[in-house]
Amino acid sequence: MRTVKILFGKSLAAATLALGLSSAMAADKPTLTLGYVNGWADSVATTHVAAEVLQSQLGYNVKLKPVEAAIMWQGVARGDLDAALSAWLPATHGDYYDKLKDKVNLIGTNYTGAKIGLIVPDYVDVQSIADLNQHKKAFQGQITGIDAGAGIMIRTEEAIKAYDLDFNLMASSGPAMTIALARAEKQQKPIVVTGWIPHWMFAKWDLRFLEDPQQVFGEAETVYTVANPGLETKAAEAAGFLKNFAWTDKEIGAVMLAIDNGETPKKAASAWVAENPERVAEWLN
């Protein structure tokens, strides 16, 4: 019995020491602030998973800030944000990057094959943006958008001019746009919205992009991780992980759907990281 007590005491002491070292390690590391685009499902999922890895695997304290796209870029440039994983280039955020490229670093690619444009349900009998005026009445002359000032909204304004559309672009938010889309889908009514991939709505409904013969919205894009130049010095280990972090349609889709189904972003991210240790290990090597 005495031997058992001694062994138990040693085990408890070792566990306490390990916990103390872990706490000390976290205390010695700087707090990191990541920004993400408020209302963008992919941005929410990607940033929360990255934050979970930084916290649970690398021992950093992480603060998350939901912001608009323009503020995200400005925040990284000023150092208010250490990094953001939602830099869509070359089209969507091209204007922001052109203005701030001397003050930020693109440190990694976290998603390839991204795309923006105008989206309709598959039951809608319109194929091209150029054909929208012919169906103005069906759409009530309206394009349902997201946040005013977002890159996709700027491109949509350009598309309205380029195609001489007699349509109004209605600003709302990412969640409000999907609510309007859900309502239209339920009633099988025509609707055209600003949209992008990756997004959980493509897993939920049969949707397609309208053809864009003038290429106003550009070709497929890449989502980059953008960081303040000081991150490498401030937190080299974190910078290394963020450079390596990249995931697939299936991976990001699983987290986005979990959130859409009612899970909190933090819990969805935590569960995904716990269920995919080998993938996480790849990012940390």
Question: PLM features: residue spans?
Answer:
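A bilobed periplasmic-binding-protein/Venus flytrap-type ligand-binding module shared by bacterial periplasmic
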Residues: 115-125, 221-234
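A conserved helix-loop-strand patch within extracytoplasmic ligand-binding domains
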Residues: 102-149
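Ligand-binding cleft/hinge of the Venus flytrap
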Residues: 50-59, 134-169, 274
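Immediate post-signal peptide segment of exported/extracytoplasmic ligand-binding proteins
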Residues: 24-34, 133-140, 278-285
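Short helix-initiation/N-cap motifs at beta->coil->alpha
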Residues: 40-41, 63-75, 169-180
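Extracytoplasmic "Venus flytrap"
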Residues: 29-48, 69
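A ligand-binding cleft/hinge motif common to bilobed small-molecule-binding domains
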Residues: 85-100, 183-208
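Bacterial N-terminal signal peptides that target proteins for export
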Residues: 2-13
